[in-house]
């Protein structure tokens, strides 16, 4: 009797397994043939401004003109700083000199700006007097991807 129960149980299991396979196969076919919903295209997020290190060497022999044009250049950079487009900026020198020296040995400018691309940076800077008056050497200027990791004000 036990043997008969085992055989009957085996047939029952086989029937259950066969039924389960049929259900799974028909369910898979239904999923495969079900109409798909095309989600609306997701627009790419707008490019976030990033930091860029901008190095502008001066053209040769422009110190007198640089000093003459500086009163028009400086307010432009104050405005760009207030708009938070320029994080920090300043002149580059041949060597350190005493504070207030009217003939400091300028050799260019450096700045960190926040924008989405080099092209946007050039577009924004092209109206600066140092570019229009050819103080900065654009052929040797560099715009480099940059990240400020630490920022600390030096103690005086």
From Swiss-Prot:
Pathway: Secondary metabolite biosynthesis. Residues 1-39 form the signal peptide. Induction: Expression is positively regulated by the aspercryptin cluser-specific transcription factor atnN. InterPro entries: Dimeric_a/b-barrel, Sec-metab_biosynth-assoc. Disruption phenotype: Decreases the production of aspercryptin by more than 80% but increases the titer of aspercryptin with Ile replaced by Val more than six-fold. The keyword Signal applies. Keywords: Signal. SUPFAM superfamilies: Dimeric alpha+beta barrel (SSF54909). Disulfide bonds: none annotated. The keyword Signal applies. Belongs to the YciI family. Part of the gene cluster that mediates the biosynthesis of aspercryptins, linear lipopeptides built from six amino acids including 2 highly unusual and nonproteogenic amino acids, 2-amino-octanoic acid (2aoa) and 2-amino-dodecanol (2adol). The core structure of aspercryptins is as follows: Ser/Ala-Thr-Ile/Val-2aoa-Aasn-2adol. The first step of aspercryptin biosynthesis is the generation of the fatty acid precursors, octanoic and dodecanoic acids, by the FAS subunits atnF and atnM. The fatty acid precursors are likely transformed into the corresponding alpha-amino fatty acids in three steps. This is Aspercryptin biosynthesis cluster protein B. The lineage of its organism: Eukaryota, Fungi, Dikarya, Ascomycota, Pezizomycotina. The gene is atnB.
């Amino acid at each position: 009797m036990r043997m008969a129960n085992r055989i009957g149980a085996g047939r029952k299991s086989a029937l259950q397994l066969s039924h389960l396979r049929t259900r799974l196969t028909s369910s898979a076919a239904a999923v495969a043939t079900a109409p798909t919903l095309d989600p609306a295209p997701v627009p790419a997020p707008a490019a976030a401004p990033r930091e860029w290190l901008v190095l502008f060497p001066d053209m040769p022999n422009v110190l007198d003109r640089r000093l003459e044009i500086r009163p028009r250049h400086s307010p432009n950079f104050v405005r760009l700083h207030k708009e938070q487009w320029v994080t920090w900026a300043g002149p580059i020198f041949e060597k350190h000199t005493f504070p207030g020296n009217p003939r400091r040995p300028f050799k260019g400018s450096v700045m960190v700006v926040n924008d989405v691309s080099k092209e946007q940076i050039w577009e924004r800077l092209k109206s600066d007097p140092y570019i229009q008056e050819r103080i900065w050497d654009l052929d040797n200027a560099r715009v480099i991807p940059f990240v400020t990791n630490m920022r600390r004000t030096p103690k005086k």
